[in-house]
């Protein structure tokens, strides 16, 4: 009887696991609508981060970094250096300038502002390195602190130290980052 119950439990769990498929995060239909706020300062901060991302980060127009970033910019991602000029030098090699899109290319879920902080939440599709056939979704965040001059002074994200130019454990699909 115990063997039958044990086999039944294994069968139920084996069948149930695929049925509990992850629901992918849903990107916002209208990114510009996410910039609205009753508080003008919060709306300005969200717009500043939105424009920085489109123009400098995705668009590769690092020549405009001073318009968006403080000189003493602090980077909390362990894979990138701090400092506006080191950011410019790094991304100048990575991203040639291209036309600026009207919206962020990454699939933005929401943009939230609180005081001097703006957080952008986005959907990312990743492949498990240990099981390459397993593709799943995560919700990523990028958080920025805006200083008294209205410039991006700090950036945080959940990135871990990359190995051989790749994130540990998973591979991001960066269709939007081209």
How would you name each of these model-derived features?
Residues 1-7:
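Bacterial N-terminal signal peptides that target proteins for export
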Residues 16-18:
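N-terminal signal peptide c-region/cleavage motif recognized by signal peptidases
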Residues 21-63, 67, 71, 173-178:
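Short, low-complexity N-terminal intrinsically disordered segments enriched in polar/charged residues
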Residues 62-118, 133:
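A solvent-exposed, acidic/Ser-Thr-rich amphipathic alpha-helical stretch
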Residues 121-130:
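Short beta-strand segments that buttress and anchor functional surface loops
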Residues 139-171:
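Short beta-strand edge/turn micro-motifs at domain boundaries
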């Amino acid at each position: 009887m115990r063997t039958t119950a044990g086999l039944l439990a294994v069968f139920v769990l084996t069948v149930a696991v695929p049925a509990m498929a992850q629901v992918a995060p849903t990107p916002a239909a209208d990114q510009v609508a996410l910039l609205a706020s009753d508080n003008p300062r919060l709306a300005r901060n969200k717009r500043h981060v939105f424009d920085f991302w489109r123009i400098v980060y995705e668009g590769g127009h690092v020549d405009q970094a001073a318009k968006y970033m403080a000189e003493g910019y602090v980077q909390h991602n362990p894979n990138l250096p701090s400092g506006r000029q080191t950011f410019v030098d790094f991304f100048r090699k990575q991203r040639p300038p291209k036309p600026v899109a009207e919206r962020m290319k990454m699939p933005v879920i929401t943009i939230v502002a609180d005081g001097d902080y703006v957080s952008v939440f986005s959907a990312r599709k990743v492949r498990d390195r240990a099981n390459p056939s397993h593709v799943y979704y995560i919700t990523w965040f990028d958080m920025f602190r805006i200083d008294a001059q209205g410039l991006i002074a700090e950036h945080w994200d959940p990135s871990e130290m990359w190995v051989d130019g790749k994130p540990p454990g998973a591979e991001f699909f960066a269709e939007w980052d081209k």
